[in-house]
From Swiss-Prot:
Its EC number is 7.1.1.1. Residues 1-43 form a transit peptide. It is found in: Mitochondrion inner membrane. This is NAD(P) transhydrogenase, mitochondrial. Its main location: mitochondrion. In the N-terminal section; belongs to the AlaDH/PNT family. It holds the Pfam family PNTB_4TM. The chain crosses the membrane at residues 475-493, 501-521, 527-546, 558-578, 596-616, 622-642, 646-666, 672-691, 702-722, 740-760, 778-797, 801-819, 833-853, 857-879. GO terms for cellular component: mitochondrial inner membrane.
Length: 1086
């Protein structure tokens, strides 16, 4: 049995397991009884995972012994990551001292400190430099490696065959960090790029140190200082890093490369790309340029000779894999430069690009300072070690993704750009057998990959296909149809009163359109709340139809009283909630307010009317005009924070004046007045109670509930008006118009009522937020619509009361069912559009009442609210790049979606802990926070507000970026942040802040996904293609705070999770925000 087990173990493909067969049993001091259960191993049907548990493996980090080498293979953060994964880590004493990492730092991260021999004998050894002779121990490091162990290091196998022979004798498996394929999936573990990035930056710093003038140009009292001119040859990682650093220091930067893509990158950094007249592509393999033709090189030399006479600093990075670096600048060119110039040769280790370079030295040749250091990354040891450590930890996690066992498989058959390609390219020796170089992968892209057109480019091409004639013809057709419709209304008008009402409706709609567009997005929530309150003027319709004495005496009067009661809930509750929200936007530095003084115009308006009425004047129509203008002022007042409270006051004055004018025109008896007052008082009391108790985070469902009341009031009013007017239809010339408007108002009110209730249920959590996609729902909705439209035929044709009231009852039921089926098919994340559409419906229902009762006030206010909701719906749809029909019918996909296969997202994500996040926050000077609905759901606005306050006190620039559809109703996040005390002037909209992301040090994404998804711009086939998003990935660093890597509402994977500048801080949003707040406070109190 022992032999059988030994055979199984030694035959395993993972080199660590082969050691288990030859392990020694150490004698112990006590005797133990051990039962050897073989049957569970031999006959168990459960599959056995390949590899070896992480907890049984030790990772060793030796001290680098190469001369002047200051780097270390793993930073304390890297150690912590491996320990968290399950590895045991041992670090040689003093290994990180030159990189400013003490032994105590490593101990705190979970590592053990041991000697060189013990560390090198680990299962897996990670190094920076390749193994070499240890002069202190008098033995080669390769001879100290564990037999059949694994080594990860820079190896350069083509240049070090002797080293490979030594490693082969130890049966080592070797992963060469210099052989990581330069493919997209491997960007996170490309150590050559990491080191080149540091070398490029350090080259500019050294050049500036040895250059005798400023880099940036200056005009001083002592004279003008011209900017330094820098030429950078080679647009790889090092060259681009140099260009970015030099440009940020104010120099004039020029860049040269044989590859067109590299020249574009130079241009994007603000450098001037240089080209020769001869056109020849320099695209090579593995991220390097190819060798060029003789003619091209001659033209290149001519360009360089000219540039040497002009520039002050030369930085060259040109390399050819496996060969000596090409000489690009001869001695004559260098000597033609101005005295005091500096040249930095980043290719010095491979011989150098300058004929005058002395590798590893700094010297001056005829007044030109030459920097030929070959250890530039080591001269920034802390940063270099941190990046190299990140490369290694990401590589280990990528090649062995299993959570329990360490295992990877080396295959000779693999596709280009896959993990199989990465593993096979990186592993240069397996179990002592040299397998370098790797075989050619399959499916290699031919030449440079075709650049996929962005969504913006596709949209521009689509727009270009529309000819000016077609564009003008479309516009002319729209105006023709509109004017034809107006002519039709004039011909069909039964009387002059209808034409006047249409005129009022049209002008009010235009005024509302232009007024609402001026409202700042931050005040969209108060706007919806105040329109909710104003829509309570459906009470006017109820008052006009009320009758009886202390109690209603007929069915129609009872319906009217109920409509008045319901509308009063809206009025009182809506204005109080609006006032609460606006009070939250107050800042401590704002001047005092005396809003009670607006009682003066309110008293003058209402009191003056009552005095005029007592004097015998009938000025109800003028009162309606004044009330309508006040309602316009209410919407206009919300255009800015400074006038928002005035707007709410004007809304109250307008509604109060309208109700007073209605009562004055009716002149009810005392008993009926008592009934009216009682209905309004009871409704108002209930509305105030609800508004006082509601939490601001529950505002969307409150708005939805209030919308349902408006819809129900419209239905009740229309049915009551039909019942009251029915006896007069035979002699009334406008009877048909009255019937049509009553039928239309009933339909709109029914959809608004039931749709709002479903929206309320979804937002409150009573109903599931997910869309309810009934089979054949479109046919069902079409049938309900056909039934509703068809019902008007018998309603208009049959003059009997029974038929009429039956048709109104039927359309009420059908529209209510349709409101349910439509809204239930819409997911919770689309509720902003649903609420704004319902808001618009409530306005059109109010207009229908205005036409029905021939009331100018209801028509004016209804047009305002209807246009307000329509504009907000349009804004929401534009923010999602979706059509209104797509949202309302429960559809998916934007108007720009191409319909092909979405791009595949590959790569690994980076996870950090709270301490890492605090370090990033502490180091950042400019921070943007982009919250999503997750912030609302977790109610994490308070710790975030306190965090922002602390960071601002430390001199950091902290702002918020809000997407229009980030919450569950327009402007919800603005109100929540205001509630927590965040000043509104640091809360910016998407269009205001998107251009600032490239200059931002850190972005905190809290509970957002689709609104920051780069697939909207990068993938034309994505269902969110073309959707405007917050471009957070353009910042220097992003921290995404989410529960998991799961998709958002649109069910689209987010590429930013896998971008190299993104770190994932996973966990509950509220707990994470609380912890961040506490950690930041603790760090600043030290």
């Amino acid at each position: 049995m022992a032999n059988l087990l030994k055979t199984v173990v030694t035959g395993c493909s993972c080199p660590f397991l082969s050691n288990l067969g030859s392990c020694k049993v150490l004698p112990g001091k006590k005797n133990f009884l051990r039962t050897f259960h073989t049957h569970r191993i031999l006959w168990c049907s459960a599959p056995v995972k390949p590899g070896i548990p992480y907890k049984q493996l030790t990772v060793g980090v030796p001290k680098e012994i190469f001369q002047n080498e200051k780097r270390v293979a793993l930073s304390p953060a890297g150690v912590q990551a491996l320990v968290k994964q399950g590895f045991n880590v041992v670090v040689e004493s003093g290994a990180g001292e030159a990189s400013k990492f003490s032994d105590d730092h490593y101990r705190a991260a979970g590592a053990q400190i041991q000697g060189a021999k013990e560390v090198l004998a680990s299962d897996l050894v990670v190094k920076v430099r390749a193994p070499m002779l240890n002069p202190t121990l008098g033995v080669h490091e390769a001879d100290l490696l564990k037999t059949s162990g694994t080594l990860i290091s820079f190896i350069y196998p083509a240049q070090n065959p002797d080293l490979l022979n030594k490693l082969s004798k130890r049966k080592t498996t070797v992963l060469a960090m210099d052989q990581v394929p330069r493919v997209t999936i491997a960007q996170g573990y490309d150590a050559l790029s990491s080191m080149a990035n540091i070398a490029g930056y350090k080259a500019v710093v050294l050049a500036a140190n040895h250059f005798g003038r400023f880099f940036t140009g200056q005009i001083t009292a002592a004279g003008k200082v011209p900017p330094a001119k820098i030429l950078i040859v080679g647009g790889g990682v090092a060259g681009l890093a140099s260009a970015g650093a030099a440009k940020s220091m104010g120099a004039i930067v020029r860049g040269f490369d044989t590859r067109a893509a590299a020249l574009e990158q130079f241009k994007s950094l603000g450098a001037e790309p240089l080209e020769v007249d001869l056109k020849e592509s320099g695209e090579g393999q593995g991220g390097y340029a190819k060798e060029m033709s003789k003619e091209f090189i001659e033209a290149e030399m001519k360009l360089f000779a000219q540039q040497c006479k002009e520039v002050d600093i030369l930085i060259s990075t040109a390399l050819i894999p496996g060969k000596k670096a090409p000489i690009l600048f001869n001695k004559e060119m260098i000597e033609s430069m101005k005295e005091g110039s500096v040249v930095v040769d980043l290719a010095a280790e491979a011989g150098g690009n300058f004929e005058t370079t002395k590798p590893g030295e700094l010297y001056v040749h005829k007044g030109i300072t030459h920097i030929g250091y070959t250890d530039l990354p080591s001269r920034m040891a802390t940063q270099a070690s941190t990046l190299y450590s990140n490369n290694i930890t990401k590589l280990l996690k990528a090649i062995s993704p299993d959570k329990d066992n360490f295992y990877f498989e080396v295959k000779d058959d693999f596709d280009f750009g896959t993990m199989g390609h990465v593993i096979r390219g990186t592993v240069v020796m397996k179990d002592g057998q040299v397998i370098f170089p790797a075989p050619t992968p399959k499916n290699i892209p031919q030449g440079a990959p075709v650049k996929q057109k962005t969504v913006a480019e596709l949209e521009a091409e689509k727009a270009a296909t529309i000819t000016p004639f077609r564009k003008t013809m479309t516009s002319a057709s729209v105006y023709t149809a509109g004017l034809t419709g107006i002519l039709g209304l004039g011909i069909a008008a039964p009387n002059l009163a209808f034409s006047q009402m249409v005129t009022t409706f049209g002008l009010a709609g235009i005024v509302g359109y232009h007024t609402v567009w001026g409202v700042t997005p931050a005040l969209h929530s108060p706007l919806m709340s105040v329109t909710n309150a104003i829509s309570g003027l459906t009470a006017v319709g109820g008052l006009v139809l009320m009758g009886g004495h202390l109690y209603p005496s007929t069915t129609s009067q009872g319906l009217a009283a109920l409509a008045t009661f319901i509308s009063s809930v809206n009025i009182a509750g809506g204005f109080l909630v609006t006032q609460r929200m606006l009070d939250m936007f107050k800042r401590p530095t704002d001047p005092p307010e005396y809003n009670y003084l607006y009682l003066l115009p309110a008293g003058t308006f209402v009191g003056g009317y009552l005095a005029s009425l007592y004097s015998g004047y009938n000025i109800e129509q003028i009162m309606y005009l004044g009330s309508g203008l006040c309602c316009v002022g209410a919407l206009a007042g919300l255009s800015t924070q400074g006038t928002a409270r005035l707007g709410n006051a004007l809304g109250m004055i307008g509604v109060a004046g309208g109700l007073a004018a209605t009562l004055g025109g009716l002149k009810p008896c005392p008993e009926l007045l008592a009934q009216m007052s009682g209905a309004m008082a009871l409704g108002g009391t209930i509305g105030l109670t609800i508004a006082k108790r509601i939490q601001i985070s529950d505002l969307p469902q409150l708005v939805a509930a209030f919308h349902s009341l408006v819809g129900l009031a419209a239905v009740l009013t229309c049915i009551a008006e039909y019942i009251i007017e029915y006896p007069h239809f035979a002699t009334d010339a406008a009877a048909n118009l009255t019937k049509i408007v009553a039928y239309l108002g009933t339909y709109i009110g029914g959809v608004t009522f039931s749709g709002s209730l479903v929206a309320y249920g979804k937002l409150q959590g009573i109903l599931k937020s997910a869309p309810l996609l009934l089979p054949g729902r479109h046919l069902l909705n079409a049938g309900l619509l056909a039934g509703s439209v068809g019902g008007i035929i018998p309603f208009m044709m049959d003059p009997s009361f029974t038929t009429g009231i039956t048709c109104l009852g039927s359309v009420s039921a059908l529209s209510a069912v349709m409101g349910v089926t439509l809204t239930a098919a819409i997911g919770g994340a689309d509720m902003p559009v649903v609420i704004t559409v319902l808001n618009s419906y409530s306005g059109w229902a109010l207009c229908a009442e205005g036409f029905l009762l021939n009331n100018n006030l209801l028509t004016i206010v209804g047009a305002l609210i209807g246009s307000s909701g329509a504009i907000l719906s349009y804004i929401m749809c534009v923010a999602m790049n979706r059509s209104l029909a797509n949202v309302i019918l429960g559809g998916y996909g934007t108007t720009s979606t191409a319909g092909g296969k979405p791009m595949e997202i590959s790569g690994t994500h980076t996870e950090i802990n709270l301490d890492n996040a605090i370090d990033m926050i502490r180091e950042a000077n400019s921070i943007i926070i982009t919250p999503g609905y997750g912030l609302c759901a977790a109610k994490a606005q308070y710790p975030i507000a306190d965090l922002v306050k602390m960071l601002s006190e430390q001199g950091k620039k902290v702002r918020f970026g809000i997407h229009p559809v980030a919450g569950r109703m327009p402007g919800q996040l603005n109100v929540l942040l205001a509630e927590a005390g965040v000043p509104y002037d640091i809360v910016l909209e998407m269009d205001e802040i998107n251009h600032d992301f490239p200059d931002t040090d850190l972005v905190l994404v809290i509970g957002a996904n689709d609104t920051v998804n780069s697939a909207a711009q990068e993938d034309p086939n994505s269902i969110i293609a073309g959707m405007p998003v917050l471009e957070v990935w353009k910042s220097k660093q992003v921290i995404v705070m989410k529960r998991s890597l799961g998709v958002g509402y649109a069910a689209v994977d987010n590429p930013i999770f896998y971008k190299p500048n993104t770190a994932m801080l996973l966990g509950d949003a509220k707990k994470t925000c609380d912890a961040l707040q506490a950690k930041v406070r603790e760090s600043y109190q030290k």
